[in-house]
Amino acid sequence: MEAHGAKPPSRNTLTAYLGVLERLYLVERLNGWAAPVRATSRVKVKPRYLPCDPSIGVFACGLNERGLLRDASVFSRALKSMALRDLLVYAGTLEPGVEPQVRYYADSDGLEVDFVLLLADGRWAAINVEIGESQVKDSIKRLQRLCKKVRNGGTLGEPAFCAVILASTDRPRRDAATGTFVFSLTTFGA
């Protein structure tokens, strides 16, 4: 990680920089969800950071529209950043005066869910963000795995809903087998 003989910044320096970026509303901290699961897998709770404005990350990577469409990794992160921004805005209307709690879920079994919305009354929702239709089936399976782990934990009920948010789809729908909503980011607040 050393470039031209320079040492990488220390963990304390990086933490301080992230704190400044967070206070300037340039990045959004996303903490891990310490889900009430009864399993041998270890739940990861270390914070992740996403740009508050997805264009910041795209600009930092030096990409234009064409470059973004060719770089699936950056496009996916930008899409997740947009989804988080919208989720925080719309979730804030569910309980006026209460800041919405949005987390991610990851464990040592390799299960990852992009966002978990937690409401003060105990309701929760699991949400994944994907680039395209080809990822929906696997994404729904991951959401269902999380629901099963939480159900087996015994202290939290079923989610209020599960959803897969896509970059684009002409088929917004509810999966018949699981009840999972599938829709595009552009219809998120409609």
Predicted features and spans:
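Hydrophobic/aromatic beta-strand patches that form the interior of the parallel beta-sheet core
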Residues: 50, 103, 125-127, 163-165, ...
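Short glycine-/polar-rich loops that comprise or flank the Walker A/P-loop
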Residues: 122-124, 157-161
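Active-site ExK catalytic segment of metal-dependent nucleases
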Residues: 122-135
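Domain-level recognition of nuclease-like catalytic cores that cleave nucleotide substrates
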Residues: 165-190
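Arginine/glycine-rich "motif VI" loop of SF2 helicases in the C-terminal RecA-like domain
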Residues: 92-96, 145-158
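Accessory nucleic acid-recognition modules appended to NTPase machines
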Residues: 1-123
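Mg2+/Mn2+-dependent nuclease catalytic core
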Residues: 132-152
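Switch/connector loops and helix/strand junctions flanking conserved nucleotide-binding motifs
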Residues: 59, 136-138, 171-176
